């Protein structure tokens, strides 16, 4: 992990499935990342506006707002936050739209741990992974 100025970057997880949040949070934390998890995308956007996290991992299919809508709003409230998509549905149109809007990675659930961690590292360092 590449820390910025000795500070561990925050990775935010946004997913409406608590079990996915728990497992993904555990994976990231065990690799040394600081993790904040959100079931509610609105609460996440409020947090992001105030805290400017380095990376946001967004599910696509969620109630209230889908991941692409969250990504669009995030560009307004925290434009420096990099987005990684983590979804259960491999939809080429969604992948294309997310990447065109600036996502640095797109991963399918269940995720390959090593590939996902490499994608988070790339996002935190400002590069694209997939």
What are these regions (language model features)?
Residues 109:
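A Lys-centered signature of the CheY-like receiver
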Residues 32-39, 47:
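Short hydrophobic/Thr-rich beta-strand motif most characteristic of the beta2 strand and flanking loop
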